[in-house]
Design a protein with these regions (language model features):
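Outer-membrane beta-barrel translocator domains and adjoining extracellular loop/strand segments
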Residues: 41-48, 85-93, 133-145, 185-194
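N-terminal targeting signals for Sec/Tat export/insertion, comprising classic cleavable signal peptides
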Residues: 30-56, 60
């Protein structure tokens, strides 16, 4: 009798595990707080040894994925617009400008483990397109004679890793990280002279939140 009960319990657990799985044909939606932390560098500006520096920002991050097989998925990363202060040590100016950007990123991912696993770590690689908007110099920048800021959009490679842990048949918690190659050219004027500066933003993106599969 005890052996029978144990067998039934094991089968119940296995059935529950299968129900909890990410599996072929599932759509996966994730949401959470996403922090963009630039690993930035730039050419020298205005003939000095100083660089432009892009500050971090945190917004709502969203992803939508589709399980092509039990182990392979396609995912799109989106977010509400990120807003970044741009600063420089040139002349002790500090923050001189700001910009907003959206970073849609398209990933192909591999999930480790079996379809019935509640814990699914994954890695991925793909491509990012970042477009900048509402860029401009603030009062400090304008006071220093700077104007007409324009940032070129960027195409670059991306890599990520993450892990999902199923709470029940549909809901799970998630933690993930991306490294994104973002390079832009900043065009601007100092007085009447035009300048261009290459800026490598190359951010780490950290997201923690939850998700739903259907």
């Amino acid at each position: 009798m005890n052996k029978t009960l144990c067998g039934v319990a094991v089968l119940a657990i296995l059935a529950s595990g299968n129900a909890l799985a990410h599996k072929e044909g599932d759509f996966i939606v994730r949401g959470g707080l996403a922090a963009v932390v630039p690993n930035d560098s730039s050419d020298d500006i205005l003939g000095s040894s100083d660089e432009l520096e892009v500050k971090s920002d945190t917004q709502l991050g969203l992803t939508l994925g589709y399980m092509i097989t039990d182990n392979i998925s396609f995912e799109v990363l989106a977010a509400t617009p990120f807003s970044h202060d741009i600063k420089t040590d040139l002349g002790g100016l500090g923050t001189i400008a700001d910009t907003k950007h959206l970073p849609p990123t398209f990933m192909l991912q591999y999930y480790f483990g079996q379809a019935e696993s509640k814990l699914r770590p994954y890695v991925g690689a793909g491509i990012n397109y970042t477009f900048f908007f509402d860029e401009g110099f603030n009062g400090t920048g304008k006071g220093a004679g700077l104007s007409d800021l324009d940032l070129d959009d960027s195409w670059g490679l991306a890599a990520n890793a993450g892990v999902d842990y199923m709470l029940n048949d549909d809901w799970f918690v998630n933690a993930s990280v991306w490294y994104i190659d973002i390079e832009t050219e900043a065009s601007y004027k100092a007085g009447t002279t035009k300048y261009k500066t290459d800026v490598d933003i190359d951010p780490w993106v950290f997201m923690i939140g939850g998700g739903y599969k259907f």
